[in-house]
Amino acid sequence: MGADRRQAGLFDLPTRLPHGLVYQPGFVTPEEETALLAAIAPLPFREAKFREYFAKRRVVHFHADEHAPSYDSGDADSFSSGPLPPFLSDLKHKVAAWVNVDPASFVHALVSEYRPGTPIGWHRDKPVYGIVIGISLAGFGRMRWRPYDGRFDRKDIVVLDLEPRSAYVMQGPIRWEWQHSMLATRMLRYSITFRTQASETATFRTQASETAR
């Protein structure tokens, strides 16, 4: 992705951060952000729910087609609002060009609304998905990572401030060997997350490691 600071986006990150995380400030322009927020406003948001628990954030899911895997088959939060609307399709192509993958590789998109005080607990995205790309809009977010195996000290936790209009990519070790969380937001914030479908190799490796634990 080149050595330019704005392009690589890694120079402000701790050197001990595992491979696989790329952070890009200014991924969308202020004008693009304004248009995205206007397009997001009328979406049919619902409160995020995992099993019997409701979260503070509200979400809208989109799947590539009716056969695409849901985020969690046991999650009432896995509803789909249909195919991608044009504004998300355009953004998907921009994201695909950035990470050099086929736009058709993305099988899931998630739009999330974080009202002030909204956190996300520690988790790792479901193994049915591979590369994860997130775009931040409107407000700042603080994202954290820690080793997934549970053997870590507080000093091992890595923190990254997500600026409005920035984007990040998680793939490789940081996708499969780390989990992440979001600290409670201080202001209204939106995020758009795109996910590819995991390869059979990646899914098998993840399932095998979980079985071994």
What is each PLM-predicted segment?
Residues M1-R213:
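Non-heme Fe(II) oxygenase metal-center motifs and adjacent flexible, charged/small-residue loops
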